[in-house]
Every structure is written in C-alpha cells, then in structure tokens.
Amino acid sequence: MTEHAIVIGAGFGGLAAAARLRAMGRRVTVLEAGNQPGGRARAFEREGFHFDAGPTVITAPHLFDELFELFGKDRRDYFDLVPVDPFYRVVFPDGRHFDYVGDDERLLAQIAEFNPSDVAGYQRLVSHSKRIFDVGYTQLVDADFSRFGDMMRIVPDLVRLRAYKSLYGLVSEYIQDDALRQVFTFQPLLIGGNPFRAPGIYLLIHWLERKWGVHFAMGGTAAIVRGLTRLLDEVGVELRLNAPVERIEVVNGRAKGVLLADGTFLGSDIIVSNADPAMVYTRLIDSSARRKHSDASVARKRYS
C-alpha cells in the first residue's frame, strides 16, 4: 500500500515538499487553512491592481527548475522568470542612488564614485562572501541537522570566517563609506532582520546574487504558485483549501494523522508541516507528546 503523506501549509515550502514526496512515490495531501495556496507568497487584487503579499524576487531559480525536472517537465512551460537589471536601486536621502548590479565593471565604477578607496575593500569583501557561501550555503543547504553534532561540525569554519559578527560589523571591516555599507547590508531587511544584529552569515546572499542573479516572475510570485499547483494537480497531489488543522495526532511517540477543524480525521504515515514552528508546537502538538519545546520555552523565543 502506498504511504500517505500529509503536508500542512501550501506555501512555497509546502508545495515543494509535496512535489518531492510525490516524486518518491507517496500519495500526498496538502492541507491549507486559507482560501488560496501560496502562504506568505499569496497575492491579492485591489481596485484592479494585483499585489504580491510577500516575496517579490527569486535569487536561486534553479531550485524551482529541480521541482519540475523531478517529473520530466520544464519549468518554463509553467511560468517565466526574467533577470532583473539592476538587482536593486538604493536611494539615499541626499538624492544619490546606487544601482546594485551583477556586472563587475559597472559596480566598481559606482563604488569609486562614492569612495575610491573602497574599491579594493569591496573586492576583498566579495572574496569573503564566497567563502561564507561555500560553508553556509553549499554545505548547509541540504543538511539534515536532526543531530546536534551535524551543526557543530561546521561551527569552526563559521567562527574562522567571523560569521558570528553582525552583518554590518563584518561589512564595515572592508567598506569605509557609510552609504556603501548600507548598500551591502540591507538584505536582512527583506526577511524582517536587522543588519546591525543579523549574523554575518547573511553575507553569503551577496555571493548568491552574483552567482545566480536576481529574477522576477512574470505575473508576480502568484504565477509561481499557479505553476506549482498546476504541476501538483498533474502528478496527482490533492490540495485541500479551507482545511485548517486542529491537531496532529501522536500515538506512542509517532505522528499518526491530523484532526481538521471540521472534525475530519486523516490518517497518515508521514506528516510534514510548513507552518510556523512555534504555532505547530504550541497549538497542533499536545504538550504530553513533546519531549522538548514546551509552551514556556517557545514563549521565551525572540523573533525578528
């Protein structure tokens, strides 16, 4: 009998997990509490205009390509991604602006206009960002981290690369001009982070953008959601909207299914949740079934 997998949440992560589970031969059901898929990448319309409610740019397009290739399909048949140039335009209060681009010659020329002595510093910064990328992304993107030792193995490398420093502090070691420091440290703002507190590991984003560019989905991120849900429908994944999960049923330490808000019980061999972890622990899993992550410990967590 084919194993049944339930995915809670139809955001990008949930839809991607559903695709990978289906490619592994599982029967998959995606449960979404809202009335449309997408999660934080949902879209809405107001006065004839369409808005992305969450993310707007894509910096690793090949990850979407992989999902479609699992089924022998071409992502371009579902939605289009176009490179953005410049990646970003940073505008300062004094009227100056900086076009953050992928072309070295154009980028270095702009840096020289702001502060010629920062050209050499930027080149060292790029080298540092690549080293952090090689550890913080290449080695960790597929890491399990189910065991504490898995994470501890890469700590020496991150310490050596000073990734424990704040992003702003790390960039300031190489860049002297305050405006340029802002240009190369704003990325944590995109996920609600503070460049003065976010760890230096975020410097890897700079190399990631140089490596793969910044892309926009024609039609907005809603087009990506439509493409992914179309793919899942074609390969036999069931997507249920307006289906909030009330509780994850745990028996003898193993999740056995979910209880929906309408009283429906769905049995499952595998449960993957793409919902916020704090909500999952405190609202979906009974405290008696949690070896750790008590309500009190979750309440003490700090969020960006």
Residue map of PLM features:
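Residues forming anionic-ligand binding surfaces in small-molecule and nucleic-acid pockets
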Residues: 198-209
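A conserved short coil-to-beta-strand element within the FAD-binding core of flavoproteins
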Residues: 241-255
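Conserved acidic residues
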Residues: 4, 256, 269
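Glycine-rich loop(s) and the adjacent beta-strand/alpha-helix scaffold that form part
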Residues: 214-234, 248-249, 259, 264-304
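N-terminal glycine-rich phosphate/pyrophosphate-binding loop and immediately adjacent elements
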Residues: 2-131
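Short beta-strand to alpha-helix junction loop
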Residues: 156-167, 209-230, 240-242
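Rossmann-like flavin
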Residues: 91-198
